């Protein structure tokens, strides 16, 4: 006997309508100040409308009123989970306009710390993603690795998070003597064992797989249409990585693989990041082994300030130092777009110079913005708890998204 269902769920005078609920902006799984207006049919998501901009601070406008050097710390405060990844795009853009050479040691140090930043970022994302779907222990272990990363940042630059260490022309200061050997030992003796232990708890865990496998499947075509980048597009099976396709600094000297997913679901995105951590460690080892001697900043005195020791002996050095930290250097008129492979995807800086000491315009291309626009597409037809897993797999930080 077949049951016949009425086309309309309306009975008598009662009209059954969909729920409309707010997810965030104070939700712990929103990873910041995301507000999503959800339309639910029972517990199934019919529609999602993400509301962004709650952390908008007018960064692009503020940069227009600062010198090129004063604008640098604003980038640390965009994606504050991977600050050096943000600085990297900006300093490369300024260097391209200035047309200056960066010493080889500075390039190696930049790549070394860009990859350490990637590991640091992925520890936070993988740990919080696992916690969002209900597991507690791996997050605590991954935060131990993240703490080690922050200690390395502090030893190199003096600050744990907002380093402002990358500078136009190189890096601000050389690393302490023992730091590179400590990093090499840390990769072998602490990073790999601790990370492998933490991942052994989740990658084959039945509950974790049920929460992530076949959730928010995005095909190659859809990933390209939505403008995905980083682990989001690689999770869909497209080996697109700016470190390989458009290498900058010394990435063309590094040997590493690009991990890609097979089915384009949340589990694949998670596993892409897991493998990226191992590849980043591989790049770091190569940087430490190949690290050359030499200066860590350009010798162009019209851009890079002189060292303290030089200022104590030379009047010209003192004048240059004073001018560079008050007026700043002038950048030739022109425009440039530079994108780097930040831990979350393609982070781009479009810089326009009018020949003065301040940027005429600095457009920031965030990674999470194009990923969030696909939330409705990815969540449709899934259950309400799946939205947290989907959001966790995107890896979004609102300092960068809202700018």
UniProtKB/Swiss-Prot annotation:
It is an enzyme of class 7 (translocase). It is a peripheral membrane protein. It comes from the Bacteria. It is found in: Cell inner membrane. Signal peptide: none annotated. One of its GO terms (cellular component) is plasma membrane. Keywords: Cell inner membrane, Cell membrane, Membrane, NAD, Quinone, Translocase, Transport, Ubiquinone. GO terms for molecular function: NAD binding; NADH:ubiquinone reductase (non-electrogenic) activity; quinone binding. The keyword Protease does not apply. Its EC number is 7.1.1.-. The keyword Transport applies. Its main location: membrane. It catalyses: a quinone + NADH + 5 H(+)(in) = a quinol + NAD(+) + 4 H(+)(out). NDH-1 shuttles electrons from NADH, via FMN and iron-sulfur (Fe-S) centers, to quinones in the respiratory chain. The immediate electron acceptor for the enzyme in this species is believed to be ubiquinone. Couples the redox reaction to proton translocation (for every two electrons transferred, four hydrogen ions are translocated across the cytoplasmic membrane), and thus conserves the redox energy in a proton gradient. Belongs to the complex I 49 kDa subunit family. NDH-1 is composed of 14 different subunits. Subunits NuoB, C, D, E, F, and G constitute the peripheral sector of the complex. PANTHER family: NADH DEHYDROGENASE [UBIQUINONE] IRON-SULFUR PROTEIN 2, MITOCHONDRIAL, NADH-UBIQUINONE OXIDOREDUCTASE 49 KDA SUBUNIT. This is NADH-quinone oxidoreductase subunit D. It comes from Novosphingobium aromaticivorans (strain ATCC 700278 / DSM 12444 / CCUG 56034 / CIP 105152 / NBRC 16084 / F199). The lineage of its organism: Bacteria, Pseudomonadati, Pseudomonadota, Alphaproteobacteria, Sphingomonadales. The gene is nuoD.
């Amino acid at each position: 006997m077949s049951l016949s269902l009425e086309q309309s769920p309306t009975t008598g005078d009662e009209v059954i309508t969909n729920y409309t609920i707010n997810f965030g902006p104070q939700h712990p799984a929103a990873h910041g100040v995301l507000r999503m207006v959800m339309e639910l049919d029972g517990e199934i998501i019919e529609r999602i409308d993400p509301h962004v901009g709650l952390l908008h601070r007018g960064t692009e406008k503020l940069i227009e009123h600062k010198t090129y050097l004063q604008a640098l710390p604003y980038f640390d405060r965009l994606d504050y989970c991977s600050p050096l990844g943000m600085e990297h795009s900006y300093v490369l853009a300024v260097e391209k306009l200035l047309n200056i050479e960066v010493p080889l040691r500075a390039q190696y140090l930049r790549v070394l710390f860009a990859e350490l930043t990637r590991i640091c970022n992925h520890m936070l994302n993988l740990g919080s993603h696992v916690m969002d779907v209900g597991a507690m222990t791996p997050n605590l272990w991954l935060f131990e690795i993240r703490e080690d990363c922050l200690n390395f940042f502090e030893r190199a630059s003096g600050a744990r998070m907002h380093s402002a260490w990358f500078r136009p022309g190189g890096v601000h200061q050389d690393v302490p003597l023992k730091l590179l050997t400590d990093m090499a030992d840390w990769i072998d003796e602490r990073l790999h064992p601790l990370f492998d232990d933490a991942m052994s708890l989740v990658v084959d865990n039945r509950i974790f797989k049920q929460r992530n496998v076949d959730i928010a499947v995005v095909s190659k075509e859809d990933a390209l249409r939505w403008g995905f980048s980083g682990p989001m597009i690689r999770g869909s099976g497209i080996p697109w990585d700016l470190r390989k396709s458009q290498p900058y600094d010394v990435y063309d000297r590094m040997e590493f693989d690009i991990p890609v997913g097979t089915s384009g679901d949340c589990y694949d995105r998670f596993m892409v990041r897991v493998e990226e951590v191992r590849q980043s460690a591989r790049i770091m080892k190569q940087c430490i082994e190949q690290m050359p001697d030499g200066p860590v900043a350009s010798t162009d005195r019209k851009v890079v300030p002189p060292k303290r020791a030089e200022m104590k002996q030379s009047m010209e050095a003192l004048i240059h130092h004073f001018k560079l930290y008050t007026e700043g250097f002038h950048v030739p008129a022109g425009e440039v777009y530079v994108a780097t492979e930040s831990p979350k995807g393609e982070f781009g800086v479009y810089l326009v110079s009018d020949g003065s000491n301040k940027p005429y315009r600095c457009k920031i291309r965030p990674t999470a913005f194009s990923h969030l626009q696909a939330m409705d597409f990815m969540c449709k037809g899934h259950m309400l708890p799946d939205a947290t897993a989907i959001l966790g797999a995107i890896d979004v930080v609102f300092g960068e998204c809202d700018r």
